[in-house]
């Protein structure tokens, strides 16, 4: 990618939703294993000319693990600074993907360590509702606002800022996918309609490209809800919550207006012809205050 687009700065990402959180916890629990992880990550990043490192530990689950996360970040920062000094290279960027809120089920992220050690935080403001944990009712998987609960992109960003992380270090996550439910009744097809589990796939997840195919092939009805800042579509008893160009653009405007560093998406391979990518990019580059 860098050979084709030299201006693109790639990061080496470690972890993800499918990674073993217990393995991360074990690594972070001791100074020796943290050092081994840190040193090997720096060596690997340099070997392949990455510009930085991205940690995606989903998720620490105890107060001790959150404390150890803070130690890991501090030691990682010290190590990349030391390596850059000795090698003469530019200091590697350090980034992490975190929960949508600074509060994780009553546990708090190590705010000071995050502020001191990371260049930015990718805030995963999605997967709020899905058939896997809400099989009986539809909902907006990545609502920017939610008048019915505190679970939303805006509430999460607000929590991070109020906890002490600068808005300029926060990056808003956008999903290029959605979730599909099976409606109990085709006639009851709005947000929070009664449902009977997942549709289309085993967990209901569906890429944006597949959503467009579903809409086209089934002449599905599409709706944009500005209260939640979400899209949904339905045909028969299949209901899909997702983000389209209008919700994506609104979220990018929000990110810019709130003073965030920017936005990221999971993931561009699900965006055919860069429809959502271009909508976000246009909004970010043409934003102005009224």
What are the roles of these predicted feature ranges?
Residues 59-211:
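Substrate-binding surface in catalytic domains of secreted glycosidases
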Residues 12, 55, 76, 121, ...:
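Conserved, mostly hydrophobic/aromatic
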Residues 28-49, 102-113, 153-158, 242-256:
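Short, acidic/polar
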Residues 1-45, 278:
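Glycan-recognition patch characteristic of GH18 chitinases/ENGases
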Residues 179-181, 243-290:
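Acidic/aromatic/glycine-rich contiguous surface patches that form carbohydrate-binding/processing clefts
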Residues 201-259:
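Hydrophobic, secondary-structure "cap" segments at the distal end of domains
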Residues 15, 52-60:
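Mobile, glycine-rich extracellular loop/lid and propeptide segments
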Residues 51, 119, 261:
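Receiver (REC) domain switch/active-site residues of two-component response regulators
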């Amino acid at each position: 990618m860098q050979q084709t687009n030299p201006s693109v700065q790639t990061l080496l990402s470690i972890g993800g939703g499918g990674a073993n959180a217990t393995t991360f916890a074990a690594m972070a629990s001791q100074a020796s294993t943290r050092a081994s992880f840190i040193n090997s990550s720096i060596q690997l990043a340099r070997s392949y000319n990455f510009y930085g490192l991205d940690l995606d530990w989903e998720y620490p689950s105890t107060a001790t693990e959150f404390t150890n996360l803070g130690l890991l970040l501090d030691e990682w920062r010290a190590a990349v600074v030391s390596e850059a000094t000795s090698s003469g290279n530019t200091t590697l960027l350090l980034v992490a993907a975190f929960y949508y809120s600074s509060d994780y089920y009553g546990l708090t992220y190590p705010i000071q360590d995050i502020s001191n050690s990371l260049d930015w935080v990718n805030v995963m403001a999605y997967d709020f509702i899905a058939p896997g944990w809400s099989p009986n009712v539809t909902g907006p998987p990545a609502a920017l606002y939610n008048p019915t609960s505190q679970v939303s992109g805006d509430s999460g960003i607000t929590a991070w800022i109020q906890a002490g992380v600068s808005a300029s270090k926060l990056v808003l996550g956008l999903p290029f996918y959605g979730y599909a439910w099976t409606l109990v009744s085709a006639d009851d097809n709005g947000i929070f309609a009664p449902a009977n589990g997942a549709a289309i796939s085993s967990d209901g997840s569906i890429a944006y490209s597949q959503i467009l195919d579903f809409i086209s092939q089934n002449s599905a009805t599409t709706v944009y809800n500005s209260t939640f800042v979400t899209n949904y579509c339905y045909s028969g008893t299949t209901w899909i919550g997702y983000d389209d160009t209008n919700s994506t653009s609104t979220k990018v405007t929000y990110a810019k207006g709130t003073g965030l560093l920017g936005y990221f998406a999971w993931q561009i391979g699900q965006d055919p012809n860069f429809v959502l990518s271009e909508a976000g990019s246009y909004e970010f580059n043409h934003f102005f205050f009224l």
